[in-house]
Amino acid sequence: MKTFHIFITGLCLATAVSCSQQQNSAEDGGNAVIENIMSRRSIRSYKDCTVGRDTLQTILECGINAPNGMNKQSWEVRVVDDPAVMDEIIDLMEAGNPDAKPGSVKGCFRGAPVMSFIANDPSYDCSPIDCGLLSENIMLSGWSLGLGSVCLGSPVRFLNNAPEA
């Protein structure tokens, strides 16, 4: 138990020193990370344009470099940027949700030029946390490159329950 308390005290001291140094640079307007985090918003209306492969690759690399428990990288990421495939996914989701209003499923994606789907490993209890960290890195790196995003939970119910998904 002593080791634990000493470690916590050491961590608190290191954090306090680190925070005071970071705070000064943020006051000077020089902390791009804090500015990026504080300015990011969910975007629900997209321009009719494509996102370049190099840009997508950079964003995904930022995502998979997120911290994760025991470096298990307990996720799978799928990226869809083909409008025909996106329409197929939307059609499957609408067919799997007969109570949905016509067009409401397509509306939830709001014309986004790219969709990314992140799956976690259900056998690892920290995987949902790891996937959340990955998602946050994706959204923040996209924002820093001038791309907006929105995190959607509603498609998850369909994707987890439909065999054709």
Q: Predicted regions span which residues?
A:
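Acidic, surface-exposed loops and disordered segments
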Residues: C19-A165
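Bacterial N-terminal signal peptides
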Residues: F7-A16
